[in-house]
Amino acid sequence: MKKIVLLFSMILMLTLAACSAPVDEPGFEAEKINVYTRDTSSGTRDGFMRGIGFADASANDSVLVAGFITADNNAIMSAMATDKAGIGYVSLSSVNNTIKALSFEGVAATEANVLNDTYKLKRPFVMMRRLDGDYVNDTEYQLTLAFLAYVASNDGADVIANKGATAVSGTGTWASQVANFPVCAQDNSAVTLKFGGSDSVQKIAEALSAAFSPACGNVKTENDHTGSSDGYKRVQGTEKDGVNYKHIGYSSRFFRDEELSGPEATRTQLAWDAIVAIVHKDNPVSNLTGEQLTKIYKGEYTLWGDVITD
């Protein structure tokens, strides 16, 4: 009799459990993948698409999955915090605990893995200055050269590292070099250096500007970041003499062939940055390969189940 009662109780419990989780509700595997990307001028997009093996999509929307969503770095971060079926990509320096960062080819996106070259999905942070003789006055020219030297110093490398990227050089302390730039010994509080270009580099650029100012006569700094392409246009390109001109422009991709008309000495790399595929925190996926990401962005994988069962 006790066995019969126990069996009946177990059947009742299973029945109640089935009723509490209706089988007609689609699971996560049936969710359509919502694909987010940067626009074609973005250095983040260029680095991501080339890194996953889908270079055709670096500057061409027509090869992407139908219905993709174009957004900037901050908007993609915000979207992944709420869109449980979304996927996008951002700079490692932008990643926080509101989203889930995916490993790439089984390797986590960390500064150590960028340095030891095991994390392959990365791109350069580069910068360009105005040409010699293309400054309002010599003070602005000398301040620009001093800033580039500061970025390359150990002090600059520390600022870059604190913002999540990996500096490519450390030439010694700024204190040991500042004497090479007499302009820094004078009061520069009436002078403004203008910075622009990649918005992925913005946090680093702002931090470098803030650290450089008191180290070089309290020069004023202004950061206005609108994309990697503008890093060239407003410094050496078609907008260099317009209202949006800049002294220094940043790019989160190597400058393209058509942007290399100026001398090599006007360009330099300041850091490497990992690019990270990101999803909602509740997404069960934790790692994707380049092939899987390519299939998602091509539209060959349209459901999360395609990825999970791959």
Which residues are covered by each model-predicted region?
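Sec-dependent N-terminal signal peptides of Gram-positive bacterial secreted proteins and lipoproteins
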Residues: K2-P22
